[in-house]
Regions:
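Short, C-terminally biased terminal segments at protein or domain edges
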Residues: 1-135
């Protein structure tokens, strides 16, 4: 929602170019992660959707940089968005590199109701704080 709110302030002439693309790429990150999460019984499909999310996150960073250069975003706002997307990219890279830690295998007895949040909180990714791992 943050990008939606920020792009509401962009000039009207950007509505059908930068604004649409910026919003689409940011929404697509979440949509691809959700789709991949539901496909984690199939490692190749899981990695494919996470890879799509990674590409969309990188595209969102590109739109952030372009909006900054056009003076549609302040440097502080652009830096905050970039930091958020770097964290997302870090987690995606971790999940893509080690899909076996995330996919459902029948021999592990994983439950279909196992939540993404519980899996991420147990992540070995260095960007996840120790306090989050304990939750």
């Amino acid at each position: 929602m943050l990008i939606y709110e920020l792009t509401n302030q962009f000039p009207k002439e950007e509505k059908f170019s930068m604004v649409d693309q910026f919003r689409r790429s940011s929404r697509s990150v979440a949509a691809n992660i959700a789709e991949g999460w539901r496909k984690r019984r199939y490692p190749a499909a899981f990695v494919c959707k996470l890879s799509d999310a990674e590409g969309e996150a990188a595209e969102t960073q590109t739109w952030t940089e372009l909006a900054l250069r056009c003076a549609y975003l302040s440097s502080e706002t652009a830096a905050d968005l970039d930091k958020r997307y770097e964290a997302i990219l870090g987690q995606l890279v971790n999940m893509i590199a080690r899909p076996e830690d995330w996919v459902i295998r029948e021999d592990r007895g994983a439950s279909r109701s196992e939540s993404l949040r519980s899996r991420i909180s147990a992540s070995p990714h260095p960007r996840v704080s120790a306090s989050r791992r304990q939750n």
